[in-house]
């Protein structure tokens, strides 16, 4: 794995920058229950960090086919839209704003590499006030193969104009971590719903409890004050 100092940072979004996975999990389990299907948390965790197409195939299998999946998808979108209308459904994770502001002040370019669509990325990050910190965005709708394939991370690095080996990726999921490693980047894991697998933990630079723990490491990782 590449070693510091790095010259750019690339972030996953869901479960890392914003606390979205829990609300989405609740929406899916509720929609499944309305169809008479018990979708366990362990079932939902199979889709975390995966590309939309792969996630949909897994959920279809759990829900009993395309038709019930599509019915559940409508209910999930309605529940999330209703929730976002009432409150900030996907708040920033602790430490995210401070870390991004510090990197920007230090002249370290940042990008997002997320399985979500680019319009969702822009909307959610703008809502929590951190979109201006990012010089580039790469969304799941822009690549043929999603995480754990490295395409998203490679696209983000290309848009920053930085070699992959000069990028430090921040991830929360197994599939995202594997994508960053396959892209040849340094990796920091901040687990959300799942702890990293042993092989990921061995390959990454650090496993942190929160992005708050990343801020003191900026001088070491980026050679920046």
Task: Locate the predicted segments by residue.
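Active-site neighborhood of HAD-like aspartate-dependent phosphohydrolases
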Residues: 2-46
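Asp-based, Mg2+/Mn2+-dependent phosphohydrolase catalytic module
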Residues: 2-7, 101-104, 117-225
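Conserved SAM-binding loop
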Residues: 17, 92, 110, 145, ...
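Short beta->alpha linker loops
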Residues: 23, 47-51, 91-95, 116, ...
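Helix-loop "lid/cap" segments that line or gate small-molecule binding pockets
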Residues: 31-32, 51-66, 124, 156-157
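Short, surface-exposed acidic
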Residues: 37-45, 65-74, 164
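Metal-dependent phosphoesterase signature
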Residues: 58-98, 106
